[in-house]
Amino acid sequence: MASRLVAGLQVLALAGTATAVLTWDEAYAKANTALARITQQDKVSLVSGIGWDKGPCVGNTAPVSAINYPQLCLQDGPTGVRFGTGVTAFTPGIQAASTWDVELMRQRGQFQAEEQKGCGVHVMLTPVAGALGKIPEGGRNWEGFGVDPYLAGIAMEVTIEGQQSVGVQATAKHYLLNEQELNRNTMSSNVDDRTLHELYLWPFADAVRANVASVMCSYNKINGSWACENEHAMQKLLKDELGFKGYVMSDWNAQHTTTGSANAGMDMTMPGSDFNGGNVLWGPQLNTAVNNNQVARTRLDDMARRVLAAWYLTEQDKGYPPINIRANVQGNHKENVRAVARDGIVLLKNDAGALPFKAPRRLAIVGSASVANPRGINSCVDRGCNEGALGMGWGSGTTNYPYFSAPADAIRARAQQDGATVTLSASDSTADVANTVRDADAAIVFLTSNSGEGYLLVDGSYGDRLNLDPLHNGNQLVQAVAQANKNTIVVVHSVGPLVLESILSTPGVTAVVWAGLPGQESGNALVDVLYGSVSPSGKLPYTIARATADYGTAIVPGDDNFPEGLFVDYRHFDRANIQPRFEFGYGLSYTNFTYSNIKVASTVRSGPATGPVVSGGRADLWETVATVTATVTNSGGVAGAEVAQLYVSYPKGGSVPETPPRQLRGFNKLKLAPGASGTATFNIRRRDLSYWHVGQQNWVVPAGAFGLEVGASSRDLRLKESITVV
């Protein structure tokens, strides 16, 4: 992480917008001084939203004039400034994860924060570590960074570093175990202690390590207790075990009681009332509870101190732009959108060099998903429809498009440079599609699968996907096109995995391009890959199965007991010896890469973590205890980038409980010219070799032989080594 941090700081310094931030100790010293100058009512105002739709932002608190504390503005979110009119529509988190590029992730976070700050937003309601994505149909999986906690954790860390370097408070959400939209307001997520630590809490530890200012508690119950009044989750795990020094805010109307939430460790309520303006649980009610000794004054002080400390940590007391959600703040940020959209494209299939295009004379484009929404790119509230090309899912994590580069428009513009003709059928009907594609050198079919937040109904779905098939009869459309054109390219824009067996078994389908969720630069990014301006370098942040049942998880109608435990996605496939269609970490290139010369150095010793608790947990968990290096060579004829991946297997037998056969514990993206070689370096932290010992309530490195495998995906592992821990 140290080398990534140095490189990231260099990027931020060059941008000229990063600001120095205080340490938590310095921020707390300032907060204590301020706390001594304000009244009990002021403290209540600091931690209470003023009510839904009572201010310019989705969340607002009252100002405290005695310390020059402003009206705090809290705003979504994951793809940009929600409701903004002069903002960038960034790529969602799942697309950033598909790049496996930590510097693009960091820059994405920085650029997002620059826009939030330019609009006067103090607290940006992002990034997302939950849903982690254990259920492939889960409605909000696309907002986060994929199903692996290590990948999600690194993405959370560098994103928050980028965001808070600009002086905006980041929010890690949704804490915790909010894995589906169905019944999210009533269900209980019941999970065992080890699974909780090793999967779902893991990326939040990375967020705390990055000094995240706030954490948002979720709608669901955790082991029978509402997340926003669950003392074990908020106090014991987050604040005590992980050393979180910021504040816990509720998701919007996720609070259920006045005293229960306060005494359990929640620090701020949002938005302060229900969506009808009633049911105020803090504000005057909190003041009364404190006066009646139902909530201790020291607890109120702790809430207010945490909120103030986060404000000082990001140095928002030193002048801040006024709130103006309609400010034009786009700058050059579309460059990051295009880069993430492009480098997150995963090439799944490419028979006989169908791609990149070699100046075809006639192209055919098919599908409603190839063009912009004919009703207008922002015509659907919170992107709550599936009309036209897909750039993001739907819900509160969306933003308005300033423009949208539609795939058909971008392909047509590029084809004209070659003097080519393009025929378009912006329909999903199979009726006359053969006439459109029959004479083309290549036919490009566009498919989608969409999901989002449960307050909107889209294509029969309240958030979670109904199945893992393409929408709008996509399989039949591909079959009809490929029957008439034997060079059919399928482009998929999707929030998550699809079952592609029908498409892959269709004769005439020569290539499948997984374009994900590209934001506003959709078409431009796709053209970069289709025409070979760059070689595709994205890798899957989840598994694509041969059948939906292969995942072993599904949306549940009541409480979810998490019976799969640790074994989700590739961990489950490996344990059950199920052959996926495309494994986690998979992705083709226009060039080839070879791996060689693996080396290992280790100082690790077995036993529990013993260091003091710092931000992120015990300090020694974050120490590098082993280093693995490998040489990666571009053995092909064009430039490309390879994501070298490190997987660790734990010792078998003895006192070690059952562990997934292999787990991601490092990745390195190398950009290489033809014939060039680079060194992939993986710094393994003590944490990465530990398991959660339920009896000791601690992270423990077991004795024995750890397997180390380096390769191009979770099932394409080219190099093997081991370390023996005593």
UniProtKB/Swiss-Prot annotation:
Pathway: Glycan metabolism; cellulose degradation. GO terms for molecular function: beta-glucosidase activity. It comes from the Eukaryota. This is Beta-glucosidase cel3A. Optimum pH is 5.5. It catalyses: Hydrolysis of terminal, non-reducing beta-D-glucosyl residues with release of beta-D-glucose. Optimum temperature is 50 degrees Celsius. GO terms for cellular component: extracellular region. Belongs to the glycosyl hydrolase 3 family. The biological conversion of cellulose to glucose generally requires three types of hydrolytic enzymes: (1) Endoglucanases which cut internal beta-1,4-glucosidic bonds; (2) Exocellobiohydrolases that cut the disaccharide cellobiose from the non-reducing end of the cellulose polymer chain; (3) Beta-1,4-glucosidases which hydrolyze the cellobiose and other short cello-oligosaccharides to glucose. The lineage of its organism: Eukaryota, Fungi, Dikarya, Ascomycota, Pezizomycotina. It comes from Pyricularia oryzae (strain 70-15 / ATCC MYA-4617 / FGSC 8958) (Rice blast fungus). Induction: The transcript levels are constant during infection. Beta-glucosidases are one of a number of cellulolytic enzymes involved in the degradation of cellulosic biomass. Catalyzes the last step releasing glucose from the inhibitory cellobiose. Has a broad substrate specificity but preferentially hydrolyzes highly polymerized 1,3- and 1,4-beta-glucans. Its EC number is 3.2.1.21. It is found in: Secreted. It is an enzyme of class 3 (hydrolase). Glycans are attached at N223, N592. GO terms for biological process: cellulose catabolic process. Keywords: Carbohydrate metabolism, Cellulose degradation, Glycoprotein, Glycosidase, Hydrolase, Polysaccharide degradation, Secreted, Signal. The keyword Repeat does not apply. Its main location: secreted. Residues 1-20 form the signal peptide.
